[in-house]
Amino acid sequence: VDLMAELLDDLRAETASLERLLEPLPDADWELPTPAAGWAVRDQVSHLAWFDEAATRAVTDPDGFTAGLPGVTSVDDLARQARGMPPPELLGWFRAARGRSMEVFAGLDARDRVPWFGPPMSAASFVTARLMETWAHGQDVADALGVAREPTDRLRHVATIGYRARPYGFAVRGLPQPAEPVRVELVMPGGDVWTAGPADAASIVRGPMLDFCLAVTQRIHLSDTGLELVGEPARAWMEIAQAFAGPPGEGRPPRSS
């Protein structure tokens, strides 16, 4: 299977997993608070829908997308603007925006360049980023509803972008990136071991892929993970790891607090 087809299949599956959480919800549950400060379930969904529309624009009209970047307000403002929308309409918006973006993604070659809010990306990385966002915001929704989702091997896409974004976590905070390489050795939900980085690196991040993915998307405090960090460069990275574009995220407090 070629890379783009695999990514699109997995993005479709990740989307369906979120839709299954949302479909049975009574309207009141769309207002439940999620672990993201100030965001209800509805805000997680409007966020995805808005950025799906932006993703379609980035692919179909890259110049127009780039020209509009300076006018984009904060994600909190975008969430506020959509708060008057009734839940059935909001779910419809998400479905339509996601469906349209999937259609335009299907016409891309893995190596095509797509502009975005951070640096431009290859089409493969771009679709991977949408999957990562869908999974991470879906996690917030699941947490709000008290649902434990079964992790899948689709997490390898989130892990890939999390690993590649190592320089970004430092750059976005104006910090120098340690020169030493870091290796990642993660156990996938299906039991296989997934690795990235030089085999002889002295600094290593080891543990469950789920924990790594929660950490790089800032959905968990590092102290609440089962990750083993070998070497200072590994710890320095994981303390600020950020797989998503935008300003430094606030992360999550330790569960014990």
Predicted regions and their residues:
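Amphipathic, well-ordered alpha-helical segments in soluble domains
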Residues: E14-S17, L21, F51, A97-R100, ...
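An N-terminal domain-cap segment
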Residues: V1-S46
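Glycine/small-residue-rich hydrophobic helix-like segments
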Residues: L175-L214
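Short, helix-capping/interhelical loops that line the mouth of catalytic, cofactor-
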Residues: V1-E6, E53-G107, D112, R154-L155
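C-terminal interaction segments
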Residues: A201-S257
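Acidic-glycine-rich active-site phosphate/pyrophosphate-binding loop
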Residues: R20-E23, A106-V114, V187-G191
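Hydrophobic packing residues in well-ordered alpha-helices of helical domains and bundles
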Residues: L8-L11, V41, L91-F94, V127-R130
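Short, contiguous alpha-helical
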Residues: D29-G71, W116-V172, F212
